[in-house]
């Protein structure tokens, strides 16, 4: 039972928070928010949560009330909320009623390309535009919208190349 395991993890986090010295609590997404909240209550330390996606993103609007409640409780107790995009930040502010002053967009980063990769000759796309979808190919990222948009655009013009790169369960 997933919710039982979330609760068990929260209990363990409380025990660890009583025994260890630390400065801040960092929790990633709803599965760890109860543990983060428990650790904050036990230790009095600030809680910073990282929102990779909300249930609004994962469920396409068919939000699970239990998951929403866990997410909202974590956000309500958080001193700082880091979101992976501005879209997620707006969802947190608008759908979870969070104070914008504590919600920040912290984009996932990539390593700069090595010189060897930078030196590879690039194809000449001066006569066409290139539109990319780079990321996990999963339902929550919406790759089907990219494909649908490509079909609509290609009905009107032909000088556009659509490129998808990534991996996932779709």
Annotate each language-model stretch with its function.
Residues 2-5, 15-32:
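Short N-terminal targeting/anchoring amphipathic segment
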Residues 5-12, 45-48, 56-73, 112, ...:
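Nucleotide-sugar donor phosphate/pyrophosphate-binding loop at the beta->alpha transition
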Residues 24-26, 33, 37-57:
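Active-site proximal beta-strand in glycosyltransferases
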Residues 25-26, 76-86:
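A short beta-strand/loop micro-motif in the catalytic core of glycosyltransferases
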Residues 87, 109:
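Carbohydrate-associated surface elements
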Residues 123-151, 163:
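Conserved donor-binding/catalytic core segment of Leloir-type glycosyltransferases
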Residues 156-157, 161-170:
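Short, structured helix-loop element that forms part of the nucleotide-activated donor/catalytic region
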